[in-house]
Amino acid sequence: MNVAYLCLAIGFLVVVAAGALVYVTTPTNAGWVRSFLGRLTRIRDVSVVQLGRAGAAVAVLLALSAAAVIITWPVGRFFRRFRPQIDGPILRWTMRHVNSTGTWHHVNFVVTHMGNRRQIQICAVVAAVIFAALWVRRGWWIPPVILGSAIVFEKFGQAALAKVVDRPPTGLPGFGTYPSGGCARTVILWGTVMYLILLTWPTISRLWRVAGFTVVALLAFVEGYTRIYLIKHWSMDVVGGWLFGTLLLLAIIGASSCFKPCRAAPAAT
């Protein structure tokens, strides 16, 4: 049990330290990062001019969501190949040391529900209503469409990955598939909510921006911790959920950015 507490504490410290590192540094100052982001921005702006904001958002979302699945798929196959060396020892250790009737087990059982599909859907509906009210003058329908797309694309993307990766079952009750849907949903929902906050109040300071996404990362870590602790997933299913959730969140952010003011289109030559 002490090791379980230690793992939780170390995870918290790592996530917070990563957030602090992002805050004190400016990764986008790197030349190659600025160049890459600049190219993506120009592609987005041209797409908005050619397809309109809604059309560009759909095109970006479809392209980047497909990329998220394509990237996460071989990672899952790799995890499947090395399951005996990676997941097996972790699962056996957890089964030997976890107390299925203690207070800590009950706490984990309650907390892990934050990543369940129904709870995520309820939170998404509440967030959609709130942001729709805040976006009345900008287009009240935009936040609900963004949040709804996040939920739908996660559901079908996760289902597709579960089929093509086809991780072997354990025979344990309630054991999930690759990638962990709870972890992916936690990243996608709260990451999308955070990005909508930034779109709604664009003058928010960098400190609060970094702090907000650090909280999202902490929620995702806690969800993954509970899924492993409660023996609901292979450990690498959780890592896959974080990966897929992050990539799909980037797709949602890319699509949502099409509704931001864009630069003037380059003049024809």
Residue ranges of each PLM-predicted region?
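N-terminal transmembrane-helix/juxtamembrane module of multi-pass inner/ER membrane proteins
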Residues: 1-119, 162-170
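Membrane-embedded catalytic cores of phosphoryl/pyrophosphoryl-handling enzymes
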Residues: 2-8, 23-24, 28-31, 128, ...
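Alpha-helical transmembrane segments of integral membrane proteins
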Residues: 6-10, 56-60, 64, 141-150, ...
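Hydrophobic, lipid-facing residues on alpha-helical transmembrane segments of integral membrane proteins
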Residues: 17, 63-66, 70, 145-160, ...
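Hydrophobic, membrane-inserted alpha-helices
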Residues: 44-45, 104-109, 124-131, 219-224
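Alpha-helical membrane-inserting segments
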Residues: 71, 75, 157, 161, ...
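C-terminal ends of transmembrane alpha-helices
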Residues: 71-74, 155-169, 222-233
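Membrane-interface loops
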Residues: 79-99, 104, 118, 122-214
